[in-house]
Amino acid sequence: MADHGPLRPLDERLGRAVAASELPVGPAEFCADLGNTAVALPVLCVVMVWAGWQGWQGWRRRSQEASDGGAPVRWWLPPLAAGLALAAVPALVVPLKLWLARPGPPQMAGGAHDGFYPSGHGATAAVAYGVAALLVLRGRRRMRADRPAAGPVIPTVIAAVALLNAAVGLGLVRRGYHWPLDVVSSWCLAGVLLAVWCAVCDRWSGTGGGRAPGR
């Protein structure tokens, strides 16, 4: 992107085709808005409160049952790290946009026309909903110690988050807010932040279960 490589014209051609397609404008705008901080942040906050409550209850129950204490359990770390992961999005996206200064699609010519790579909305949605899903899966894993989990929870949550982020990305391109690779790059950035979140929780929370299931 920075050097106007061979992917750029292909990306812009695809973006123009999607923006001019017959995909409904209303649903596309709705999906694009799901990447807005005003939407994604409250969703994450609700999950953070739930995860903190679940972690605190589990810590208190184990403290009452165990006399030796064992390894320290930082039940507050996963939700706190989730909030910090979302806060890191603008801290990383804004400098990248200023540095690369990629022009936006034609539909954005009326406003600021530079600084569209990577997509802030795409990264916000991927991190907020992704880390919210990881918090839910982490909480469900702790609950399984007391009772079996009902149904295919893990595949359902993963599929829902993947579809949600795909819808956000498609909406951003359909409405002409971003080029396709703007969105893909934001997903890559989000993947790094989610991996860091898992590593931090695995290393310092003291409860285990920060890794993605099956890994």
Where are these regions (language model features)?
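Hydrophobic alpha-helical transmembrane segments
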Residues: A32-W56, G130
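N-terminal transmembrane-helix/juxtamembrane module of multi-pass inner/ER membrane proteins
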Residues: M1-V43, L98-A109
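Small-polar-interrupted transmembrane alpha-helices in polytopic inner-membrane proteins
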Residues: L80-R102, P155-L170
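Transmembrane alpha-helix boundary/anchor motif
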Residues: G5, G26, A87-P95, V131, ...
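Helix-boundary and loop/linker segments of multi-pass membrane transporters
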Residues: A17-E22, D68-W75, Q107, R147-G151
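Membrane-embedded catalytic cores of phosphoryl/pyrophosphoryl-handling enzymes
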Residues: M48-V49, A109-R215
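Interfacial segments of alpha-helical transmembrane regions
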Residues: V46-P90
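Membrane-interface helix-boundary signature
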Residues: V25-A28, W76-P79, R147-V157
